Amino acid sequence: MNRKVVACLSVLLIVVLTSCGGEKTSESNRVVVGIPADVNTFNPLFAFTVDEGAITELLYLSLADFQWNAEQGELEAYPMLAKSWEWAKDSSSITFHLRDDVKWSDGVPLTANDVVFSLDVYSDPVVDSRLFGIFEDLYTDKENHIDVAKSFVVKSDYELQINFKPHSSPDLVDIVHPVIPKHIFERYKRKDLETAKDNFNPVTSGMFVLKKWDRNQTITLGVNKNSFLYKPDKISELVFKVIPDYTSRLTQMKKGEIDLMELIKTEDINDLKNNVNVMLKTIEGREYEYIGWNNIDPKTYEEKKEFAPNKLFGDKETRIALTYAINRQEILEDYLYNYGELAATPISPIFKSAYDQNIKQYEYNPDKAKKILTDEGWSDSNNNGIIDKNGVEFEFTLTIPSGNPLRPYEATIIKNNLKAIGIEVNIATLEMGTMMDDIIARKQDSWIAAWYIPIPIELKSYWYSDLQNTPLNFVGYQNKTADKLMDKLKIHLPKERQKKLYYQFQEIIHEDQPVTFMYWISDIVGINKRIKNINITPLGAITHCWEWSVK
């Protein structure tokens, strides 16, 4: 599977993943976070999972950091390694002024040369980092490797100018990433960086340092008292405890053996609400569930590598009928206990300036679904209970991944809903990796999955018509008008102009219905009430931990 695709898939789906109990955390100044799996690295170059990303960003700082402005529904940048920055009037460059008091944990000063080295390595195809291919606004070669001479001007140890290509649309979020120490990693050949021993005994710049790692047990981060972020009244230790079994994590949460866990199941909410030591928060608007309809014919693609309309899902009216026929609200209420909301497009309600709240949902209406299908020429010509058209019966396989109890629940309701309008659905369960391989190869008819969306909004990777170069467009959606809108949205525009383009895109994708957008699912987070100053936002739960304190 393509490495870049794997990086995106690492945040694709909620999969509910045992460990014995330990001492209670309530009498210490440390915080214990329960996680379902161990990490594979402490190097941000290769932090492909959500937990790896969260931990490495505590160890390695970036030029700037971001916080979520809930009122505006957008990111706000604030200084971190850089104390300030300014853009050229034409956005052709940005100049960063770095702090001069930051040292790596081995005592070596952090300078602009570390920043240049980091971006160079991130973009190196030999390294194949999690960020490879995203630096299109900088000067790069044919392999997307940054041209260091053209892109960077190191004016001093603490002043760096970054230059951008003409007609590009640079954004701060595209160039601000965890900085790694040049003096440590320049000793390795680039091809050997992923297995470098210093990935596991890291020299870091953040408020935290790796204190101890017991593989598949615990990751212990201690505070870096030399960090400019250090405050003596905040937490002294942050422990990530590996507990693969969900029930065991939940039990330890209730007993106070861990202080925080994410992905709490809705059926456990009432029990936790009755626990005097636990408070519940939600991360909203980052993940939507969807039913993928393969818009292209899998047989034609497999045999000829050509894109022909799918015989069942190739026209938008049929896809709209399918959405009308599925009772999404029932699943949202009965399984998710309304911890979420119905989805209409891939743009989340958290993006207040971009989200079009006037888009009308395709609410459950099987009669309307039947009428649309009849108008499209579908009928039960042989009275066998399955509608057909031109000799093709409307029967398909709906594939779901193993390991998440929500998926078979959804699939059963979908099967029954579609049966009621004359469509036969066969449910197949596959291991996640196998299912994704088939989807990427465009072999599946239909599937249930979820996207964990990036911030800021990214549409082109998922919906652009160039299917050869857009591997995350799993359903094979193609619309040239939508393409033009996505191209324009890559350019810096006034907010009102940008808002108009987002609205137009939502109208198009809602009318085309390339997938059935099911609902936005809230990630329910359990937190021990002894933790103070913790701020749960769409950016996640494990952020800005240097601000946490313990009562």
Indicate where each model-derived feature is located.
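Long beta-strand-rich cores associated with HINT superfamily self-processing modules
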Residues: 527-551
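N-terminal lobe/hinge region of extracytoplasmic solute-binding protein
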Residues: 35-89, 203-204
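Gly/Pro-rich hinge or "lid" segments in bacterial periplasmic/extracellular proteins
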Residues: 67-72, 174-233, 237, 355, ...
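Ligand-site clamp/hinge motif
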Residues: 193-199, 226-271, 415, 424-426, ...
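Extracytoplasmic/peripheral linker and loop segments enriched in polar/acidic and small residues
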Residues: 92, 153, 311, 316-320, ...
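Acidic-aromatic pocket-rim loops
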Residues: 284-304, 408, 434-491, 544-547
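Surface-exposed binding/hinge segments that line
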Residues: 86, 97, 133-187
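Append "and occasionally in soluble cytosolic enzymes with long acidic Gly/Pro-rich linkers
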Residues: 220-222, 229, 310-416, 504
